[in-house]
Amino acid sequence: MLLPTTIQPQTARKSQLPRGNSCLVGLHIASPQLLRVQPLVRTEPQSCFLSDLCQPPAQGFVQRPLPALQVVPAKRVPAPKAPDEQGSMLTPLSASDPLAVTSLSSSSAHPFISNLHTRHTEKLKKSLKVKTRSGRVSRPPKYKAKDYKFIKTEDLADGHLSDSDDYSELCVEEDEDQRERHALFDLSSCSLRPKSFKCQTCEKSYIGKGGLARHFKLNPGHGQLDPEMVLSEKASGSTLRGCTEERTLSLTSLGLSMPADPCEGGARSCLVTESARGGLQNGQSVDVEETLPSEPENGALLRSERYQGPRRRACSETLAESRTAVLQQRRAAQLPGGPAAAGEQRASPSKARLKEFLQQCDREDLVELALPQLAQVVTVYEFLLMKVEKDHLAKPFFPAIYKEFEELHKMVKKMCQDYLSSSGLCSQETLEINNDKVAESLGITEFLRKKEIHPDNLGPKHLSRDMDGEQLEGASSEKREREAAEEGLASVKRPRREALSNDTTESLAANSRGREKPRPLHALAAGFSPPVNVTVSPRSEESHTTTVSGGNGSVFQAGPQLQALANLEARRGSIGAALSSRDVSGLPVYAQSGEPRRLTQAQVAAFPGENALEHSSDQDTWDSLRSPGFCSPLSSGGGAESLPPGGPGHAEAGHLGKVCDFHLNHQQPSPTSVLPTEVAAPPLEKILSVDSVAVDCAYRTVPKPGPQPGPHGSLLTEGCLRSLSGDLNRFPCGMEVHSGQRELESVVAVGEAMAFEISNGSHELLSQGQKQIFIQTSDGLILSPPGTIVSQEEDIVTVTDAEGRACGWAR
C-alpha cells in the first residue's frame, strides 16, 4: 500500500537560506526557497506534493514501478496556503496527522491499488506453461493451436502420454485470447513517452522538438518553432543527458532568463523531482509530471525525460557542453529578435561541424575535394590576400603579395614558353593580348619578332625523305653529270664474271600469274649503288609503269626506262627459273618466270635519232657498251606466245642479258650501224652448262618524255665498273615503245656469243620492218643480216630465217 508524503512549505531559517543557488538531494531551485523531499518508507512507493504559497498549486508524483511497467495516473491535490510566504520546507508527514493521510490515500492511491490487485489476480488464474524435462516451454504457435492434436496442458515430465487422436486435451479459451490481444494494444499498459510538442493547427503531437520542426518544415503554413523554445530545449536536453552536477548547472542557466522575483513573475518553470539515491542506484525509472504555469508569457515548457541510470560520460565533457549552451543562450538574448537571428543561430552548429571535419581531413583530400569548389567562387587576388593574411597578420601586405606574385609570374612565363615552342604557327586557339607590357615580360613579343624575321625556323619541320631526295637530285644533277663525263675518260674495266648468288636468285622468285609484287632488291656485289624498291603497276594494254625507290628515299618512275621481262623455260626437270638482270647503275631488277612453255615480255628503250652514235669498228662498239646512257631492264610478269623448242631435248637455267638503248631514228640502219647494248649478266659460260638455250622474250615499253637520272643524279655502269664512257647527254634513257609492238622470236647463246632476233612489224623501232639479229661476242655486239635464226656448228655460225632460208656467218 502506498504511503503518500505531503510537502508543506515552511519558512526557512536565515542560516539555512543560501545566498545563491542551493542543491539538496539532487533537487535544485533557482529561488530563495528550499525544498527537501524525504520518503516515509523507502520500500514503498512515494508521492510528493510540491506547493508554494505565492503560486498556483504545483504537484510532483514519484512512484517506484512494479515489474509490469505502466504509467501511474497522478491526482492533483491543492495544498493549503500557509501564512508565511517567505519560503517553504518539505517535511515528512508524522504519525499524528491521520486525517491528511486518509484523505490523500482515499483520493489518489485507492484507485491505483485496486487496479493493481485485480490485474494480479487475473494473472494468477492463468494456467501454467507446459514445460519439457529440459525446461523448454512446449507449446505450438497460436495460429496452429486449433489444428494441433497433441497439445499438453501439463508438464511432460510429470504427466503421461496420451494415445487419443482427438482434441480432448486441447482447451483454448477464446475470451482469454481476446483479453490478451486487447492487453497488447492497451495504451495504459505501455510505457510511452508523452507527446508534449503539439501543433496548434492540425492537432498533431510529437515527442521532441525535432518531430515538430520536421512537421513545420513539411507544412510551412502551420507555423514555426519559437527560437527561445529551441534554445531552452537544447539546454534541457544537455542537462538531462549528463550527471547530477550537469543538470544542476543547466537548471541554473535556465533560471537566468526568468524573472528573479517569485511573487511578481507568476508561474516559474516546473521543478524536476527525483527519488532518493538508493532508487537511482537500483536502476528504477522515475516518471516526472510537469505543470503548466498560468501566465504563458513568463514561463517555459520543458518536456519530460526518462532517466534510466547514470551515464558513463565524464563530468568534464558534460560541463563543457553545458557552458556552451549557456553561452549560446546569452548570445541569443543579446541578439535582436527576428527570423534572421534564428537563421544565424541555426547556421552556427553546421559551421562548427564543418570546421571539425576540415580539421580531421587530410591535406591531399582537402585539396582534391575543396579546391574545385573554392576555385569557382574565389578569385586569384582574393586567394593571394588570404594566403598572405594568414602568415603576415601584423606586417604590411604588399611585400608578401609581391613575393607571391614573382613566383606566380615565373611559373606563368615557363608555361608560356612551353606553349609557344610546342604550338608555334599551328595553334588553333587565338591568344588575346590586352597589355603589351605583360606580353613582353612573358616573352611573347620577342617570339613574334623572331617569327617575322625567320618564319621558316619557327614552324614545325616535317620534311619527307622523298622531298629530300628530289631536292638533292635537282640541285646536284648538273654537277654530277659533269663529274660522270669526266670519269668516262678513265680506263674501262671489264665486267666481273661471277655467278649469281643463291640469295638473290631466291629473292627474285616469280609469280605464276604474272603480277609483280613490290619487294626490296639488294646489290649483288661490292661497289653497287644502294638498294632500291621496285614496284611494278598492273600491266595495261597501252602502257606499263614501274616505280623505283632509291636507297636514299628518292622516288622516280622507272616506266620511262628500259624494262625487260625475261622468262626461261627449263627442259630438263625444272619448270621455270627466276632470272635477274641489273641495269647500268648497278640496281638489280626482277625477271620472273611466267607460266611453263610461255613467252615473257621485255621492254626496251630507244634513243632519239639525233643523239645516236654510229661506230664501224668493234672497239667503238665495246666502248659504247660502257656508256652511261644504258637503262636497266625491269622485270614484269606476263605471258606471250609459246615458242616451239629449237634446240636439243635438254636445257637448264640461263640468263638473259640486258638489251638497252635501241636506235629509233625512223631510218633504215646500215649493216655497219651498231645499237649500243650490253649483257649485264655474269659470264654466260658460267651460267649455261649446255650449248644453247632458247629464250622467248617480248618487248613492252612505256612512253617517257625525257631523260631520267638515277638516285645519285647519274647512271653507273654494272658490276664494279665505276668509270663511265660516253656522255650522259648523248645517251639518255628516254624511250618510247608501245606494248604489243615487238617480240623477240628467239635468243640463242653460243659460248660467249648471244643472238637476238627481232620480228618484223615494228615501224617505229626499225623503220623498214625487217628482221634484225644482234650477235654479241667477247669483242662486242655485231649486227647480223636480217631474218635469220642462229645455230652453232663448231666454229661456223649458221643463220637461218623463219622460213628456213639459211646464210653462213663465220665468227
Swiss-Prot record:
A Pfam family it matches: DUF4764
Zinc finger residue extent: C2H2-type: 197-222
UniProt-annotated stretches for the region Disordered: 329-349, 455-555, 612-654
GO MF annotations, alphabetized: zinc ion binding
Polar residues composition-biased segments: 501-510
UniProt keywords, alphabetically: Metal-binding, Zinc, Zinc-finger
Basic and acidic residues bias locations: 476-485
Entry protein name: Zinc finger protein 839
Organism field: Homo sapiens
